[in-house]
Amino acid sequence: MNRFVAIIVIFALISITSCKSDKTETHTKEHQPHWSYDGETSPEHWVEIEKNSDCDGNRQSPINIIDIDTKPTQQKDTLLKVLYTPKTALKQVTNNGHSIQFDFEAGDSIQYHGEIYHLSQLHFHEPSEHTINGIRYPLEIHLVHKSKSNAYTVMSVLAKEGAKSQLFEFFESFLPIKVNTTKEINQSSDLTTLFPKNKNFYTYGGSLTTPPCTENVNWIIFKEPIIVSVDEVLKLKNNMPKNNYRNEQPLNNREVSINTFQ
């Protein structure tokens, strides 16, 4: 009987040791370095952290756009069509620890160079990631569109401080939101009111501005900023990491076009 008890005790000890080992492995995996905008995991270290990314590529974003170096083209040559309805359906809002992100139901899209890109989400960078003639704006909004071939077209709207924006008031009505939290929205809004009155824009080929920094992005950056209030900027800022932007990347002989309407 004592031998039987001893065997049970040995098996129990083996089992406990095994469980402790498993828990240690899980703990280690959960605490692997993850990219951020600060310290040892800031953009300068993304290449080290994200081993299989394009973050060290030659077509990276964002960039500094210098007006005198851009190539003038006509709007009709770029074939950009914004196919948004007056009631774009917002599905949910998430604080993913990097930005505030609004996700959309399927339906809205743009057509760029003959290909359809479907609107999936928009998020914010404060201050802006792209700069124009060295000027960094208080805020940049990215409207992310994806094609069936998994290519991206991102429309960027820069913002400066001034009067209140009705659309921003709507977005911020869902704040505050804690990190790693999602709120269901299931409401609609007219996103076309987000764009500046002057529709001239810059275009160039680049990458996602966050890991994995994939280099299959068409960038459309409206030249004229929109106006939002100081309070709106601060409210958004309080729900995001400080300075959640990536620094200017080398142009590496890429061409930037300025597209104007006739």
Regions found by a protein language model. Name each.
Residues 4, 19-262:
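Alpha-carbonic anhydrase
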